[in-house]
């Protein structure tokens, strides 16, 4: 049983990182740089906080979306609960920034919330699917 959750964590992490990297590579210069560029670090990002975010967020995806899907045997459980998790987490981040920062655009808020919803839902579903392909559905 624990092996299934370890595989699930790894599979979900790979799915999340792969999908998110496509978005970040394409939207960094199209969305974030033009809209909130003055808030961003020049030449990259801090690796430590990024790794901590990924490790803990994927754990949250396992607890709230992929784990329940592994118990129910339904990918739709992972997709729905993952999408809801993504919506609430990204909404909290974006609306807090929108409310407290001088430079934060409505465009970034809306697109980032939509992205977080899609990303977390789809990565949860893919993580569930990969796990069941590797470990079976018992």
Q: Over which residues does each language-model region extend?
A:
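Juxtamembrane/disordered regions of integral membrane proteins
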Residues: 1-115, 119-138
């Amino acid at each position: 049983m624990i092996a299934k959750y370890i595989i699930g964590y790894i599979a979900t992490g790979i799915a999340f990182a792969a999908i998110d990297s496509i978005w970040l590579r394409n939207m960094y210069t199209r969305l974030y740089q033009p809209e909130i560029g003055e808030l961003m670090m020049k030449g990259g990002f801090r690796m430590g906080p990024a790794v901590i975010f990924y490790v803990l967020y994927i754990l949250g995806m396992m607890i709230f979306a992929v784990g329940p899907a592994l118990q129910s045997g339904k990918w739709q459980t992972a997709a729905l609960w993952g999408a809801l998790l993504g919506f609430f987490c990204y909404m909290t981040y974006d609306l807090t920034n929108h409310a407290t920062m001088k430079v934060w655009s409505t465009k970034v808020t809306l697109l980032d919330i939509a992205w977080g919803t899609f990303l977390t839902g789809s990565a949860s579903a893919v993580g569930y699917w990969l796990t069941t392909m590797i470990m079976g559905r018992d």
